[in-house]
Amino acid sequence: MAAENEASQESALGAYSPVDYMSITSFPRLPEDEPAPAAPLRGRKDEDAFLGDPDTDPDSFLKSARLQRLPSSSSEMGSQDGSPLRETRKDPFSAAAAECSCRQDGLTVIVTACLTFATGVTVALVMQIYFGDPQIFQQGAVVTDAARCTSLGIEVLSKQGSSVDAAVAAALCLGIVAPHSSGLGGGGVMLVHDIRRNESHLIDFRESAPGALREETLQRSWETKPGLLVGVPGMVKGLHEAHQLYGRLPWSQVLAFAAAVAQDGFNVTHDLARALAEQLPPNMSERFRETFLPSGRPPLPGSLLHRPDLAEVLDVLGTSGPAAFYAGGNLTLEMVAEAQHAGGVITEEDFSNYSALVEKPVCGVYRGHLVLSPPPPHTGPALISALNILEGFNLTSLVSREQALHWVAETLKIALALASRLGDPVYDSTITESMDDMLSKVEAAYLRGHINDSQAAPAPLLPVYELDGAPTAAQVLIMGPDDFIVAMVSSLNQPFGSGLITPSGILLNSQMLDFSWPNRTANHSAPSLENSVQPGKRPLSFLLPTVVRPAEGLCGTYLALGANGAARGLSGLTQVLLNVLTLNRNLSDSLARGRLHPDLQSNLLQVDSEFTEEEIEFLEARGHHVEKVDVLSWVHGSRRTNNFIIAVKDPRSPDAAGATIL
């Protein structure tokens, strides 16, 4: 009976145990009195209750399987017909070992072959990288104000130059081909974004006031002494700083690209011919005439012009670096002498004390994108404030263009008033507080609440101070195969700056006009204390190179934008960003569409030639005083969406060009 009871218990085990006994017939027979290893089971359950469940934990399953008593005879096996157990006389370990041995031999051969192949491919790739011809597998794009400089930027990229190398060469080229807009005697700002690292830096090389410059001196004599308008040029220091940070080719080689343009000659652009024709004879020095009007008359578009003087200067800078410009050499002495001869107060010490600034751009999130722009004394915060205000309106394709234009006009009135309160934060700590307010979404909502949807405000919502910026500026926009984006805007302020030119051919800027002082303008606008004249200070600036990237992640739309036209450039950038990011228009259409700009001093709403009479009538019905002009500003751009890149110039510019590397 005891034997029958035991058999009955074993049959019950075979019938109700969840164990598949075909999987344990090769296990060795265990002594019946072997104690159960209960402690390890408890430890595993303590670690993870779910994995400790015998139905789910493979370790627990195997341990419980070892506790089952296996039949000891064939008769016992036969007495359990319902059991799935089968007797085996093979040595389970020897059979398994032989089978594993075979499998291991085959696996070893396969793994060895794969490793050998992979090693060979890796060695070949490394040798190709180090000894093969260099190759570029991605696209690139260049946009500048002159076709010759755009092609030069492409040339630098094709010779394995970095995006910043291309930007430096193209910017120096514009100082040669478009001397009315930019040059070695001016300054600017460059915004660089590294897509792979998702990092951005801004190089600020805006001109600074000479140490001996005083407000009362400017107020009394600025119209008769052009030398007073000359600030310490930052162009050479800024471009060299950018190259030190991001350059790939040697500095001398980058400058040699631009020097070749000056030496070999270039075709006079339509814009340069127009600017020279508009220069009044009394404003031209004899040296200026010899340089730009060798025949005694303004050159025609397309005529060939050589600048061997600038080629020589660039050769010197390529060999000696910025020290040749700032450290008291011949170039420094010439610039100081030229400015002082025309009533200026700039000194050699001002040049030696100058430094370019490397800082972070200001940023704001707009429609799922991060907009990056220069901080004060530049007006990037006002640009972001305009976008923050517009973001709260229901601007979709279903909203009429006329209604959208009204909202844009009222928003820009606020943004430009905010811009007039900015200046150099090094000299006024309240500017940082003003900047923070401009970047605030809460503040934007408050300002938006003061905009009437159907009627123009009869007077500015905020106090407006004197607004006057450089009307001419040169733009360079690069999206390189190295996954860098570069946006740069530079200027001499007025066309040809101060009109003063050194014996070496360097035109000097007139950037001190961007400061504010009493009774400077004909309409007697209130001067801005934040932008008052002080030694070493940098004046308010509307140079706004702007980069847009996805707010999250690396995939999506990137933009590089620039504009000229001073305050009108801020208005233009705002409307282009609105068209691309809110209304989902392509970049070409966004740049071509008509733009407006509220002139706060005259209380006129200026619109360009692209506006229809119906649109003008609608705006006038809303209370706007509309003035139609030919062109407000040029806004160029480049766009990258994933791996597709396009370069687009503003169609209003007769000379600008965009080119894409395929």
From Swiss-Prot:
SUPFAM superfamilies: N-terminal nucleophile aminohydrolases (Ntn hydrolases). One of its GO terms (biological process) is glutathione biosynthetic process. The keyword Cytoplasm does not apply. It catalyses: an N-terminal (5-L-glutamyl)-[peptide] + an alpha-amino acid = 5-L-glutamyl amino acid + an N-terminal L-alpha-aminoacyl-[peptide]; glutathione + H2O = L-cysteinylglycine + L-glutamate; an S-substituted glutathione + H2O = an S-substituted L-cysteinylglycine + L-glutamate. Residues 128-662 are extracellular. It is found in: Membrane. Hydrolyzes and transfers gamma-glutamyl moieties from glutathione and other gamma-glutamyl compounds to acceptors. Residues 26-90 are annotated as: Disordered. Its main location: membrane. Residues 72-83 have a biased composition (Low complexity). InterPro entries: GGT_lsub_C, GGT_peptidase, GGT_ssub, Ntn_hydrolases_N. Belongs to the gamma-glutamyltransferase family. The keyword Chaperone does not apply. It comes from the Eukaryota. Pathway: Sulfur metabolism; glutathione metabolism. One of its GO terms (cellular component) is plasma membrane. Cleaved by autocatalysis into a large and a small subunit and the autocatalytic cleavage is essential to the functional activation of the enzyme. Widely expressed, but at low level, except in the airway epithelial cells. Detected in brain, heart, kidney, liver, lung, spleen, testis and trachea. This is Glutathione hydrolase 7. It is a single-pass type II membrane protein. Its EC number is 3.4.19.13, 2.3.2.2. GO terms for molecular function: glutathione hydrolase activity; leukotriene C4 gamma-glutamyl transferase activity. Heterodimer composed of the light and heavy chains. The active site is located in the light chain.
